[in-house]
Amino acid sequence: MSTAVSLPQLAIGEEVPASPRRALYPASAPADSFADSQRYYENLYGPTRYDANTRALTVRAHAFRALMVTRDLADVASEALHGQTLPIFAVRHGIRVLMTAPPTAADDIVRFFPRGVTIVGRAAELALPTPGNPTRWWLAAFPEGAELPPYHEVVEAVLGACSG
C-alpha cells in the first residue's frame, strides 16, 4: 500500500528552506507517491530498489552518471551551462548531485580526483529523492526525459567552478 505525499511547489532557482526536513520537488515532478516515483525512475534509469538504510529508492548508474559536489560548485557549474537542463538534487549536508549522461570513450574521468568531486561511476548505486524521505530533494530540472546533459560539458562546468 502506498501513501500519497503532498508535494510543495519549488521554483527553479528558489532558495531551499533552512530546514530540509521535508522533501521538496519542483512543480513539474510527475511523481507524488512512492509508487509513482518508483515507476517514473524505472522508466528513466532502469530497475530501482528500496534501500532500508537510506530509506530511499536507489538505481544503478548505467543510463547516467552523477557528480557529487558542494553547493557552491553546483551553483557555479549550473550557471556555466547557460540554461541547459541539468537535473540537480540536494543531500541534506550541503551536497549537490548533478545528473549527467554516461561518459564517452573520449572523456577523461580521472580529471576530478584532486578536485574533491565524487563520481557516481558505472554500476554504482545512487539513492534518489524519494517521497517521504526528507534527506534528498530535487532542486532543479526534475528529469522529465531520458536525455541528460553530456558528461564532458558538465565536467568542464564543474572544473571551471573549481578554478574560479
Residue ranges: model-predicted function:
Residues 120-148:
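A recognition module on extended beta-rich or small alphabeta surfaces enriched in W/G with H and D/E
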Residues 1-93, 102-104, 138-164:
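Signature for HUH/AEP ssDNA processing cores
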Residues 99-123:
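Helical (often loop-to-helix) elements that flank the catalytic cores of nucleotide-handling enzymes
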